[in-house]
Structure formats: structure tokens, C-alpha cells
Amino acid sequence: VDKRVIFAVAGAGKTTYIVNRLSRGKRSLIITYTNANYNNLRKKIIDKFNGEWPENIELMKYFSFLYKFCYRPFLSDRVKAKGIIYEPNSNIYLKESDSEYYITPNRYLYSNRLAKLLIKMQVVDLLKERLIKYFDEFIIDEVQDLAGRDFELLEHLMTVKMDTLFVGDFYQHTYDTSRDGNFYKKLFDNKSSYEKRYVDREIIPDNYTLTKSYRCSPQVCEYVKSNLGIDIGSHRERKSDSTIEL
């Protein structure tokens, strides 16, 4: 079983890397967060397979994965939700043991607490079995955008006995999929402690494969490395007359 998290730099070609490893002989589930990256992945996968979408590959946006793959098979009959609402619960006095903590009065699940509901209802082991049943590898692109309750669920799923690949840029953490008060508030304060969360669950960190950028010039990479402490190189050739204006 190959279990890795690749820490990529900006413009390193992480989407291309993921697509290049896909084949018709392996059942792959790919999860991504933003619409832009979903569309980019979809286009590149179709291009790779000569204009066709291979039946053995499933590409899902994160909340579709949570709702359709994780929630529906195990909890739809018990919870009877109508869908997801993408705004926080305004009632700060509810406890995790209250059903209203997770769902609105008109039966819409709070997106930032759906992952927590799956954990609370003890379906994580069933999710792992479902992943293994339908897929040979589990891939998450933009993994740096999973935070809060969603990262808590990811920590549970990290231990699934199958090939897993997580790819992301720690320093491009932009979105918080499940901001929920102070829960995991300091998750991205320190890269070493963030990386350790993967290591503790036997995920091998890879800080080498995607550390050169196609987007940034050597001069820009040197500036970022010197001033921000980010280990980034460039695939581009140095131009002697290049300057950086600040």
C-alpha cells in the first residue's frame, strides 16, 4: 500500500502529476475543492484518454463526496436531510449532542458540520469499507483547503488500507472548508506540526517531487526562498536582465 502526501509549490504541475498517474487498469477516486480545479482536472483527464471519460475514474467535488458518497448510503434514512446549506449555524448555544447542531429546522445539513456528523454517528469504518469496495486508490487534490471538521474526518480516513495520495501547497491555504469556532484553529500555524499529523497516521510526506515551479522565474523563486523561507525552485531558465519590482 502506497500512502503519501506531496507538498507542492505554486505552479509545480500538481494537477498534471495526478492525471499522469491515472490508468484504465486502476479504479481511482479523485476529490478536489474548487470549481476551477474540478474543471481543470476534468479537461486534462478527458484529454489523456483521447476525448473519453474512463469508467474506472470518479472525480468529485469535496462536498459532493461528503453528501453523496459518505452521508447518503449510511445516514439518509436516519437523518432525512434535504441537502446542504453553506452557512454556519447561528445558534452558538447548541451542543454536539443536539440534532439541531448539525441540521436546520427545515432539514438542511450545515456544510461545516457534516464531517463531524459522520464521525458522531460512527460511520467512519463503513466509509473506509466503502472506499475499498469501489476504488483502488483515493486521491485528494488541494488537500490544504480541508480544515476544521473536514480535516478531522480526513485524519480518520488516512488509515484506510488502500493506496492514498494527497497533494497540496501548504502555503496556499486559502479556503476553510469547515471553519467552526476555534476547532483546529491552529492547524496551519506550523508546517512541521501539520506534516506530523500525516506521519502519525503512516502517511509518507514528500517534500521533493513537486518543488519546482513552471510558473515562477528563478529570480522570483530565489526571492521567495530567501524572504519567506519556502523551498521553491524553477523549471524556467534564468534571464540575466530579469528584475523583481516590489
Question: What do the PLM-derived regions correspond to, one by one?
Answer:
Residues 1-246:
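The feature marks helicase ATPase cores and/or their adjacent C-terminal helical subdomains
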